Amino acid sequence: NWYKPEIAANVKREERELFSIQSIHRHVYAPMLNTQAGIISNYDHLFKRYAPIARWDWRLLAAQCYQESCFDPKAYSWAGAKGLMQIMPETAKHLRLAESDVYEPELNIYAAARYINELNTRFMDIRNPEERKFFILASYNGGFFHIRDAMALAKKNGKNPYKWIHVAEYVLKLSTPEYYNDPVVKYGYMRGSETANYVSAIYSRWQKYRGTRNTATITPTDDIPTIYEPHKASKKHRFKLKNVKDN
């Protein structure tokens, strides 16, 4: 099992670092709107509506949304990502999401669900659907081709390229010349720590959302700060779909 308890501690530390005056630039919202009622956000009805398109549990979609925007529909990054699910302009164009609609919560979530579905299709060689989720999340953040590079490195080094616990190791190593210059790597450098932490944070929060639904046993402040602003994206072309090297 890739997820281990110590990951939650790492996520907690990362989020505390992010919860600083420098990282706040828009509205901030709690990661759990009403614990007793099992209400995660004001957009739960949209997550439930479009999660089947993504083929995901709606709470996983919610966890990803919080990581992307802290449920701020007007969130934007210096790189141009916009809205609840931080859709990049190039991705919006690919999904036929008009610039005028990118901040509209329903259309933004719908576009993200369609993109997740597309990534799911592109990772069908990962036969375990639960394992596949890790790769989809990583690709959403770091780029599909970078994750394929990490899989190629895992295979070359005798690891299982279809297990995230093995591939994550090489996602992290793709920030070092020894690995991003390897002949099997086609798309070069990536900031692997951001992507690995992104996957860990979403998975951890998803587990919390699943545990807090319709119960009062876990409060929003258990392990996760009540509010914090998502950090800025570091990659300009996180969602690039063309078969060219990412920047």
Predicted regions and their residues:
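Low-complexity, Gly/Ser/Thr/Pro-rich intrinsically disordered linker/tail segments
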Residues: 194-247
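Secretory-pathway/luminal and periplasmic proteins that interact with or process carbohydrate-rich
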Residues: 23-29, 69-78, 94, 119-122, ...
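Substrate-binding/active-site groove segments that recognize
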Residues: 74-100, 107-118, 176-177, 202
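Extended ligand-binding regions for polar small-molecule ligands
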Residues: 1-19, 41, 196-199, 203-210
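Alpha-helical scaffolds flanking conserved acidic
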Residues: 57-63, 82, 130-138
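Export/targeting segments at the very N-terminus of extracytoplasmic proteins
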Residues: 22-71, 106-109, 123-127, 215, ...
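Second-shell loop/turn segments in exported
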Residues: 30-37, 47-50, 72-75, 94-105, ...
